[in-house]
Amino acid sequence: MRPSHRVLTVTCALLLATAWLSSTAGASEPLSDFNATFQSLAVNSKGEALVTYQRADGKVRHLLAWGAVNANAPTDQAVPQVHFKYDYSGGWGKYHKSSYWSSFANKCAPYDGPALPYVVAGCKAPDGSYWAIQSWQRALPLLGFDPWKPQQTAFELHLSHWSGELPKLEVYGHWTYGGAWQGLFGRLTYGGSPVHGFGATGDGNPLDRYGRNVYIDTFNSVYGAGWKRESGILVHKPTGTFCHSFVPQKPFPGYPSQETRPAAPGERYRVTVMGPGVTPVIQWEGAGLTAADRQAAASVTAIWDQVMTGDGKCAPER
């Protein structure tokens, strides 16, 4: 096949909690105010961001965020991943000034950084770093199921802050299991180092701020027209790699049906992941495979051998 890989970006620091006092939160902890309507992003000369949005109940919230940029590499589990501190009262928790947000001096210049998917706002801080807000439906059900719970359709607001190099998401399409099925494999790195966590639940949810899941969508497949969520996969330790084959699968417990879902290769694929620390979510998109791509199978296998070295979990899909 003709391998392609493209690096884009989105955000990765999610907003949490409803506390009045200052709190800390990891970059991958979702905001409790789902489906909020973004209003403004401001950044002052002290490195604080003020995010103003309207909650679904109509109430306006002024969120103060500070204390984090970029990400740490997962070299030592004892070293915490970077994360924002939040004051959901707009300054009362940090400064005991109820009007702090109203006199916030915005010094952020127009955004001139890399293109971001799902972006609703971005700007360039006085120190040259970037801040961004994006809105994303991360909780869609897997295996192409239509949402059946309100929270599955929720839009999350994500805040990010970074300078310099962005995370890199490599994704390649290939034929798996002797050419019977289409699949994707790839690797998530930051600053040349693999991104991974140190622990996860049995169903693949990270147990620390280092771990990340990639979310795979398929376009115009047997699931129906448009984009449908196929899978969510934990990136592997210590390689930062992942793989997925579009094969028939049995739905998860609690899904509306337990009938085996058909293989769902699509015309296009999309892979999205929240970057490490407070870096942006990044996204790759590429074309599905065709019969002509089989002629390049050997070259893609060579890429697999280079990218997936050390990943024993994915070896059967080589």
Question: In which residue ranges do the predicted regions lie?
Answer:
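C-terminal segment of classical bacterial N-terminal signal peptides
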Residues: 17-25
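Membrane-embedded alpha-helical segments in integral membrane proteins
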Residues: 16-17, 51
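Bacterial N-terminal signal peptides that target proteins for export
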Residues: 1-11
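Extracellular, repeat-based ectodomains that mediate carbohydrate processing or recognition
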Residues: 26-318
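N-terminal export/targeting leaders of redox proteins
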Residues: 11-12, 20
